Amino acid sequence: MPVHRINSLWLKHISSARPVVRVIGYCIALAFALCSALFVAAELNPQKMQAVMQSRYGSDGVALLGAWNRMLDSSRSLDNREKITQVNDFFNRHIRYTDDVTLWQKSDYWATPLETMGVRAGDCEDFTIAKYMSLLELGIPTEQLRLIYVRAQIGGAQSKRFQAHMVLGYYSSADAEPLILDNLISRIEPASKRPDLRPVFSFNSEGLWVGNSAQSQADPTARLSRWRDLLARVREEGF
């Protein structure tokens, strides 16, 4: 497993974590890489996606899928900064926030992009997953994207209330400060402009990075099975 570099201003390198956490982190990173390899090598199957969308969600779902495909087609020639803006705006505009219990009758469910577009709703994880997979489809390298679990401060700068949250980080280079794509706010901001977010750990299709937070409310090991299940369902839907 290669040594991963990460912006020291926001997330600390996995090697700075406690030894036990570091060993577990590397094992999880390897498992993420193995179960993600098939997805990374896959190509989009628009016909299959449309057939699945039609059978599950009808004409409304197909209409949004068509809009998503048109957004992708019109964004392919753009630079990466413009691509992340187009994708962020698309999902923040078309998807409404709804919790998993209301949508799926489960306490924690990771929806595929097709499911999220089909019901036009999702929680923070669903927004992030849909944006991540859309940007991979637009050709942004995996190593420039991270799904990041954070503790989000709710109620202003003086508030002591935090909740578990997920955002997408875009890294223009290995040492760059990440730009944060979030469903809580419409604009894309650098991490330094988001003091309301406290990073816990992050991952992508290559591995997982763990910081020093002792207050993590999102166990990385519990997420691996959901990630594997998500990738399997994504493939079945033609992504």
Segments from the language model and where they lie:
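N-terminal Sec-pathway targeting helices
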Residues: 17-25
